[in-house]
């Protein structure tokens, strides 16, 4: 990775828009908040004819330079990541994203990296307890029912956690990174048929 200037980021977002892309995804993790700020400035120009998703599960906390979360991003805000999938964590993450985006509009709110691929199996189990017993899922539902978001889901790197989530709640969509490809077809066995069944 290397430093990306604001004008280069805006030019890339504009090129995507000009090419016809109307779905933009971001997250607090990306650039430790900088990506949401930049996407927010772009969508202010684009208007309401797009779909925007961001993610919950990582809170960004101010910190000393020595405590910045070691990510691969370069020249980003001085923040450390705290994972939190509880009711308060989801609500705080949503509010913080709204502030960084400079807009009250988020269409899809995705649980970010809640799975064992990021946290190990014990961590995944803890995260699911936070989500379903600690109120994180209730927070997502409240936001959806209040019309503050249109859909809830998960942005993850393993399809197995998506199956678990579908077994526990009414999720609308999943952003599955690289787990269904020409070479990796396992999701076809149970996960994608379950998605079809659940509409």
Give the ranges of each region predicted by the language model.
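N-terminal binding-site loop/beta-alpha segment at the start of enzyme catalytic domains
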Residues: 1-62
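Active-site mouth loops of central-metabolism enzymes
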Residues: 1-7, 75-91, 125-128
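Short, acidic/polar
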Residues: 3-16, 86-100, 157-164
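Beta/alpha (TIM)-barrel catalytic core signal, keyed to glycine-rich beta->alpha loops juxtaposed to Asp/Glu
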Residues: 7-10, 29-32, 42, 114-199
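A structural motif corresponding to the C-terminal end of an alpha-helix
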Residues: 15-20, 96-105, 139-151, 198
């Amino acid at each position: 990775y290397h430093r990306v200037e604001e004008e280069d980021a805006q030019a890339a977002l504009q090129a995507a828009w000009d090419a016809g892309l109307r779905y933009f995804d971001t997250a607090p993790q990306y650039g430790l908040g900088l990506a949401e700020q930049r996407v927010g400035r772009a969508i202010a120009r684009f208007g309401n004819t797009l779909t925007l998703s961001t993610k919950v599960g990582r809170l960004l906390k101010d910190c000393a330079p020595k405590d910045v979360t070691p990510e691969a991003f370069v020249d980003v805000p001085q923040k450390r990541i705290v994972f939190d999938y509880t009711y308060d964590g989801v609500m705080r993450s949503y509010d913080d994203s709204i502030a960084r985006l400079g807009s009250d509009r988020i269409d899809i709110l995705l649980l970010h990296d809640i799975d064992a691929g990021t946290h190990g199996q014990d961590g995944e189990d803890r995260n699911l307890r936070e989500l379903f017993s600690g109120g994180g899922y209730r927070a997502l539902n409240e936001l959806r029912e209040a019309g503050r978001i249109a859909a809830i889901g998960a942005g993850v790197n393993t399809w197995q956690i998506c199956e678990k989530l579908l077994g526990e709640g009414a999720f609308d969509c999943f952003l599955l990174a690289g787990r269904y490809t020409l070479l990796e077809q396992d999701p076809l066995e149970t996960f994608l048929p379950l998605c079809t069944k659940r509409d």
